Protein backbone atom coordinates (compact mmCIF):
# COMPACT_ATOMS: atom_id res chain seq x y z
CA UNK A 1 0.00 0.00 0.00
CA UNK A 2 1.34 3.46 -0.93
CA UNK A 3 2.56 5.74 1.82
CA UNK A 4 0.32 8.80 1.50
CA UNK A 5 1.07 11.16 4.35
CA UNK A 6 -1.78 13.63 3.73
CA UNK A 7 -5.27 12.55 2.72
CA UNK A 8 -7.19 14.40 0.01
CA UNK A 9 -9.61 15.74 2.64
CA UNK A 10 -6.80 17.21 4.74
CA UNK A 11 -5.07 18.84 1.76
CA UNK A 12 -8.34 20.24 0.43
CA UNK A 13 -9.22 21.70 3.83
CA UNK A 14 -5.75 23.21 4.25
CA UNK A 15 -5.90 24.96 0.86
CA UNK A 16 -9.43 26.29 1.43
CA UNK A 17 -8.55 27.57 4.88
CA UNK A 18 -5.43 29.37 3.62
CA UNK A 19 -7.16 30.87 0.59
CA UNK A 20 -10.43 31.86 2.26
CA UNK A 21 -8.56 33.61 5.08
CA UNK A 22 -6.54 35.70 2.63
CA UNK A 23 -9.46 36.54 0.36
CA UNK A 24 -11.62 37.60 3.32
CA UNK A 25 -8.90 40.10 4.22
CA UNK A 26 -9.01 41.76 0.82
CA UNK A 27 -9.90 45.45 1.00
CA UNK A 28 -10.16 45.78 -2.75
CA UNK A 29 -12.92 43.51 -4.05
CA UNK A 30 -15.96 41.52 -3.01
CA UNK A 31 -17.32 38.15 -4.13
CA UNK A 32 -20.48 37.31 -6.04
CA UNK A 33 -21.66 33.71 -6.42
CA UNK A 34 -24.36 34.29 -9.04
CA UNK A 35 -22.34 32.56 -11.80
CA UNK A 36 -22.19 29.37 -9.75
CA UNK A 37 -25.93 28.89 -10.25
CA UNK A 38 -25.97 29.80 -13.96
CA UNK A 39 -24.85 27.98 -17.09
CA UNK A 40 -22.34 29.51 -19.47
CA UNK A 41 -18.84 30.92 -19.18
CA UNK A 42 -19.45 34.58 -20.03
CA UNK A 43 -21.08 37.58 -18.36
CA UNK A 44 -21.99 40.99 -19.77
CA UNK A 45 -21.62 43.96 -17.43
CA UNK A 46 -23.50 47.15 -18.25
CA UNK A 47 -22.47 50.49 -16.74
CA UNK A 48 -25.11 53.20 -16.93
CA UNK A 49 -24.83 57.00 -16.88
CA UNK A 50 -27.54 59.63 -17.29
CA UNK A 51 -26.70 62.91 -18.99
CA UNK A 52 -27.55 66.22 -17.30
CA UNK A 53 -30.08 68.48 -19.02
CA UNK A 54 -31.06 70.53 -15.95
CA UNK A 55 -30.97 74.19 -17.01
CA UNK A 56 -32.35 77.56 -15.98
CA UNK A 57 -35.05 78.60 -18.44
CA UNK A 58 -36.67 81.95 -19.14
CA UNK A 59 -40.41 82.56 -19.15
CA UNK A 60 -42.02 80.77 -22.07
CA UNK A 61 -38.85 78.83 -22.86
CA UNK A 62 -38.34 75.11 -22.24
CA UNK A 63 -35.60 72.53 -22.50
CA UNK A 64 -34.17 71.83 -25.92
CA UNK A 65 -33.37 68.19 -25.19
CA UNK A 66 -34.20 65.31 -22.86
CA UNK A 67 -32.22 63.64 -20.12
CA UNK A 68 -31.14 60.32 -21.60
CA UNK A 69 -29.52 57.19 -20.23
CA UNK A 70 -26.41 55.84 -21.90
CA UNK A 71 -24.55 52.67 -21.05
CA UNK A 72 -21.42 50.84 -22.01
CA UNK A 73 -21.32 47.07 -22.08
CA UNK A 74 -18.29 44.86 -21.58
CA UNK A 75 -18.20 41.10 -21.90
CA UNK A 76 -16.03 39.04 -19.58
CA UNK A 77 -15.17 35.36 -19.89
CA UNK A 78 -14.80 32.99 -16.97
CA UNK A 79 -11.28 31.56 -16.62
CA UNK A 80 -9.77 28.67 -14.71
CA UNK A 81 -6.87 29.66 -12.45
CA UNK A 82 -4.67 26.70 -11.60
CA UNK A 83 -1.52 25.99 -9.61
CA UNK A 84 0.51 22.82 -9.18
CA UNK A 85 3.05 21.65 -6.62
CA UNK A 86 4.80 18.41 -5.71
CA UNK A 87 6.90 16.74 -3.01
CA UNK A 88 8.38 13.33 -2.37
CA UNK A 89 7.59 11.02 0.52
CA UNK A 90 11.20 11.34 1.65
CA UNK A 91 11.01 15.15 1.70
CA UNK A 92 7.88 15.01 3.84
CA UNK A 93 9.53 12.57 6.25
CA UNK A 94 12.70 14.67 6.56
CA UNK A 95 10.73 17.84 7.26
CA UNK A 96 6.91 17.56 7.51
CA UNK A 97 6.53 21.35 7.37
CA UNK A 98 7.58 21.28 3.70
CA UNK A 99 4.05 20.24 2.70
CA UNK A 100 2.40 23.11 4.58
CA UNK A 101 4.94 25.51 3.07
CA UNK A 102 4.23 24.34 -0.47
CA UNK A 103 0.47 24.52 0.02
CA UNK A 104 0.79 27.96 1.63
CA UNK A 105 2.77 29.10 -1.41
CA UNK A 106 0.04 27.86 -3.74
CA UNK A 107 -2.65 29.71 -1.78
CA UNK A 108 -0.59 32.93 -1.79
CA UNK A 109 0.07 32.65 -5.52
CA UNK A 110 -3.64 32.17 -6.14
CA UNK A 111 -4.46 35.31 -4.16
CA UNK A 112 -1.69 37.25 -5.93
CA UNK A 113 -3.12 36.19 -9.29
CA UNK A 114 -6.56 37.52 -8.32
CA UNK A 115 -4.99 40.72 -6.98
CA UNK A 116 -3.20 41.38 -10.29
CA UNK A 117 -6.48 40.89 -12.14
CA UNK A 118 -8.27 43.25 -9.75
CA UNK A 119 -5.60 45.93 -10.22
CA UNK A 120 -5.89 45.59 -13.99
CA UNK A 121 -9.62 46.31 -13.61
CA UNK A 122 -8.88 49.27 -11.32
CA UNK A 123 -6.85 50.75 -14.16
CA UNK A 124 -10.13 51.23 -16.06
CA UNK A 125 -11.37 53.79 -13.50
CA UNK A 126 -12.82 56.95 -15.03
CA UNK A 127 -12.67 59.18 -11.94
CA UNK A 128 -9.06 60.26 -12.33
CA UNK A 129 -6.74 62.96 -11.00
CA UNK A 130 -3.50 63.46 -12.91
CA UNK A 131 -0.41 62.94 -10.74
CA UNK A 132 3.26 62.71 -11.77
CA UNK A 133 4.51 60.98 -8.56
CA UNK A 134 7.62 63.16 -8.79
CA UNK A 135 6.74 66.73 -7.83
CA UNK A 136 8.40 68.08 -4.69
CA UNK A 137 5.99 71.00 -4.31
CA UNK A 138 4.60 71.33 -0.78
CA UNK A 139 1.36 69.36 -0.22
CA UNK A 140 1.36 68.24 -3.87
CA UNK A 141 0.40 64.60 -3.25
CA UNK A 142 -1.90 65.38 -0.32
CA UNK A 143 -3.85 67.83 -2.50
CA UNK A 144 -4.11 65.22 -5.26
CA UNK A 145 -5.61 62.74 -2.80
CA UNK A 146 -8.13 65.32 -1.60
CA UNK A 147 -9.10 66.06 -5.22
CA UNK A 148 -9.57 62.33 -5.89
CA UNK A 149 -11.76 61.95 -2.80
CA UNK A 150 -13.86 64.86 -4.04
CA UNK A 151 -14.60 62.88 -7.22
CA UNK A 152 -15.87 60.00 -5.11
CA UNK A 153 -17.81 62.29 -2.77
CA UNK A 154 -19.73 63.76 -5.70
CA UNK A 155 -21.63 60.46 -6.03
CA UNK A 156 -20.91 58.68 -2.76
CA UNK A 157 -20.52 60.91 0.28
CA UNK A 158 -19.45 58.10 2.61
CA UNK A 159 -15.65 57.66 2.55
CA UNK A 160 -15.62 54.72 4.97
CA UNK A 161 -14.35 51.43 3.59
CA UNK A 162 -11.86 53.00 1.19
CA UNK A 163 -8.20 52.01 0.92
CA UNK A 164 -5.39 53.53 -1.12
CA UNK A 165 -3.31 50.98 -3.02
CA UNK A 166 0.22 52.04 -4.02
CA UNK A 167 3.40 50.51 -5.50
CA UNK A 168 6.76 50.12 -3.68
CA UNK A 169 8.29 53.01 -5.65
CA UNK A 170 5.31 55.22 -4.86
CA UNK A 171 5.71 54.32 -1.19
CA UNK A 172 9.14 55.98 -1.04
CA UNK A 173 7.84 59.07 -2.84
CA UNK A 174 4.75 59.36 -0.64
CA UNK A 175 6.73 59.04 2.59
CA UNK A 176 9.05 61.84 1.48
CA UNK A 177 6.18 64.01 0.24
CA UNK A 178 3.83 63.63 3.18
CA UNK A 179 6.24 63.38 6.09
CA UNK A 180 4.25 63.79 9.30
CA UNK A 181 1.02 64.08 7.29
CA UNK A 182 1.22 60.30 6.76
CA UNK A 183 -0.60 59.28 9.94
CA UNK A 184 -0.07 55.82 11.43
CA UNK A 185 -3.35 54.56 12.88
CA UNK A 186 -3.11 51.38 14.96
CA UNK A 187 -6.66 50.34 14.08
CA UNK A 188 -5.70 50.15 10.39
CA UNK A 189 -2.63 47.95 10.80
CA UNK A 190 -2.59 45.11 8.24
CA UNK A 191 -0.23 43.54 5.71
CA UNK A 192 1.34 46.29 3.60
CA UNK A 193 -0.12 49.15 5.67
CA UNK A 194 2.21 52.19 5.81
CA UNK A 195 -0.08 54.86 7.24
CA UNK A 196 -3.16 56.97 6.44
CA UNK A 197 -3.59 60.14 4.42
CA UNK A 198 -6.72 62.31 4.58
CA UNK A 199 -8.28 59.52 6.66
CA UNK A 200 -7.68 56.83 4.02
CA UNK A 201 -5.48 53.82 4.94
CA UNK A 202 -2.52 53.41 2.54
CA UNK A 203 -1.45 49.86 1.61
CA UNK A 204 1.54 48.89 -0.54
CA UNK A 205 1.42 46.03 -3.05
CA UNK A 206 4.07 44.87 -5.51
CA UNK A 207 1.24 44.17 -7.96
CA UNK A 208 0.39 47.88 -8.22
CA UNK A 209 1.95 49.71 -11.22
CA UNK A 210 4.20 52.76 -10.77
CA UNK A 211 2.10 54.91 -13.11
CA UNK A 212 -1.05 54.87 -10.96
CA UNK A 213 -2.42 54.37 -7.46
CA UNK A 214 -6.01 53.70 -6.48
CA UNK A 215 -8.48 54.80 -3.82
CA UNK A 216 -10.93 51.94 -3.84
CA UNK A 217 -13.88 50.49 -1.97
CA UNK A 218 -14.53 46.72 -2.28
CA UNK A 219 -17.86 47.54 -3.98
CA UNK A 220 -15.97 48.70 -7.08
CA UNK A 221 -14.42 45.35 -7.98
CA UNK A 222 -16.30 42.04 -8.06
CA UNK A 223 -14.95 38.52 -8.14
CA UNK A 224 -17.63 36.43 -9.87
CA UNK A 225 -17.21 32.92 -8.53
CA UNK A 226 -18.12 30.13 -10.94
CA UNK A 227 -16.64 27.30 -8.91
CA UNK A 228 -15.01 27.45 -5.51
CA UNK A 229 -11.57 26.19 -4.60
CA UNK A 230 -10.98 22.60 -5.69
CA UNK A 231 -7.95 20.37 -5.32
CA UNK A 232 -6.88 17.27 -7.20
CA UNK A 233 -4.07 14.87 -6.37
CA UNK A 234 -1.85 12.59 -8.39
CA UNK A 235 0.91 10.26 -7.31
CA UNK A 236 3.82 8.50 -9.00
CA UNK A 237 4.06 5.34 -6.92
CA UNK A 238 7.39 4.33 -8.42
CA UNK A 239 9.21 7.55 -7.45
CA UNK A 240 6.98 8.26 -4.43
CA UNK A 241 6.17 11.73 -5.78
CA UNK A 242 2.96 13.48 -4.69
CA UNK A 243 1.41 16.12 -6.97
CA UNK A 244 -1.37 18.51 -5.94
CA UNK A 245 -3.37 20.81 -8.24
CA UNK A 246 -5.33 23.78 -6.90
CA UNK A 247 -8.03 25.44 -9.02
CA UNK A 248 -10.49 28.30 -8.80
CA UNK A 249 -12.90 29.22 -11.60
CA UNK A 250 -14.29 32.74 -12.00
CA UNK A 251 -13.56 36.25 -13.24
CA UNK A 252 -12.68 39.68 -11.86
CA UNK A 253 -14.43 42.82 -13.13
CA UNK A 254 -14.82 46.52 -12.41
CA UNK A 255 -18.56 46.70 -11.74
CA UNK A 256 -19.15 50.08 -10.06
CA UNK A 257 -17.00 53.05 -11.07
CA UNK A 258 -18.61 55.22 -8.39
CA UNK A 259 -16.51 53.46 -5.73
CA UNK A 260 -13.04 54.05 -7.15
CA UNK A 261 -10.77 56.98 -7.98
CA UNK A 262 -7.33 56.83 -9.56
CA UNK A 263 -4.27 59.07 -9.33
CA UNK A 264 -2.32 58.51 -12.53
CA UNK A 265 0.36 59.81 -14.84
CA UNK A 266 -0.56 61.48 -18.12
CA UNK A 267 -0.80 59.59 -21.40
CA UNK A 268 2.04 60.35 -23.80
CA UNK A 269 -0.07 60.24 -26.98
CA UNK A 270 -2.68 62.85 -27.84
CA UNK A 271 -6.31 62.09 -28.62
CA UNK A 272 -7.27 63.63 -31.96
CA UNK A 273 -10.69 64.06 -33.61
CA UNK A 274 -10.86 63.90 -37.40
CA UNK A 275 -13.22 66.72 -38.36
CA UNK A 276 -16.39 65.20 -39.91
CA UNK A 277 -18.35 66.86 -42.69
CA UNK A 278 -21.91 68.16 -42.36
CA UNK A 279 -24.35 65.22 -42.46
CA UNK A 280 -21.81 62.61 -41.37
CA UNK A 281 -23.09 59.68 -39.29
CA UNK A 282 -19.71 58.65 -37.90
CA UNK A 283 -16.95 60.36 -35.96
CA UNK A 284 -13.38 59.04 -36.04
CA UNK A 285 -9.93 59.87 -34.78
CA UNK A 286 -6.71 58.60 -33.23
CA UNK A 287 -5.39 57.97 -29.72
CA UNK A 288 -2.69 56.03 -27.87
CA UNK A 289 -2.28 52.40 -28.88
CA UNK A 290 -3.03 51.28 -25.31
CA UNK A 291 -6.37 53.11 -25.03
CA UNK A 292 -9.36 50.88 -24.33
CA UNK A 293 -12.14 53.39 -25.01
CA UNK A 294 -12.84 56.89 -26.33
CA UNK A 295 -15.91 58.76 -25.10
CA UNK A 296 -17.26 61.18 -27.70
CA UNK A 297 -19.64 63.99 -26.74
CA UNK A 298 -21.82 65.96 -29.16
CA UNK A 299 -24.12 68.36 -27.34
CA UNK A 300 -25.83 66.42 -24.55
CA UNK A 301 -25.24 63.00 -26.11
CA UNK A 302 -22.30 60.70 -25.53
CA UNK A 303 -20.99 57.79 -27.58
CA UNK A 304 -18.31 55.23 -26.78
CA UNK A 305 -15.76 54.00 -29.30
CA UNK A 306 -13.48 50.99 -28.82
CA UNK A 307 -10.08 51.81 -30.38
CA UNK A 308 -8.02 49.38 -32.42
CA UNK A 309 -4.26 49.98 -32.67
CA UNK A 310 -4.66 53.66 -31.88
CA UNK A 311 -7.57 54.38 -34.26
CA UNK A 312 -11.22 54.79 -33.30
CA UNK A 313 -14.59 55.31 -34.97
CA UNK A 314 -18.13 55.47 -33.63
CA UNK A 315 -21.61 55.79 -35.15
CA UNK A 316 -23.43 58.97 -34.06
CA UNK A 317 -26.61 60.85 -34.82
CA UNK A 318 -26.18 62.88 -38.00
CA UNK A 319 -23.88 65.83 -37.32
CA UNK A 320 -24.75 69.32 -38.48
CA UNK A 321 -22.82 72.49 -39.15
CA UNK A 322 -22.04 74.19 -35.86
CA UNK A 323 -21.99 70.98 -33.79
CA UNK A 324 -19.14 70.93 -31.29
CA UNK A 325 -17.46 67.55 -30.84
CA UNK A 326 -15.36 66.55 -27.84
CA UNK A 327 -13.56 63.30 -27.12
CA UNK A 328 -11.68 61.80 -24.18
CA UNK A 329 -9.38 58.76 -24.53
CA UNK A 330 -8.96 56.29 -21.66
CA UNK A 331 -5.88 54.07 -21.24
CA UNK A 332 -5.52 51.50 -18.48
CA UNK A 333 -3.69 53.02 -15.51
CA UNK A 334 -3.27 56.50 -17.02
CA UNK A 335 -5.11 59.81 -16.77
CA UNK A 336 -7.70 60.42 -19.53
CA UNK A 337 -6.49 62.41 -22.54
CA UNK A 338 -8.87 65.09 -23.79
CA UNK A 339 -8.90 65.98 -27.48
CA UNK A 340 -9.04 69.52 -28.80
CA UNK A 341 -12.68 70.42 -29.49
CA UNK A 342 -13.76 70.29 -33.12
CA UNK A 343 -16.58 72.38 -34.62
CA UNK A 344 -18.33 70.99 -37.71
Where are these regions (language model features)?
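N-terminal "assembly arms/tails" that initiate or stabilize quaternary assembly
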Residues: 1-73, 221-222, 226-227
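Alpha-helical scaffold segments that mediate packing/assembly in large oligomeric complexes
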Residues: 88-155, 262-266
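Extended, solvent-exposed, turn-rich assembly/linker loops in the middle of proteins
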Residues: 126-194
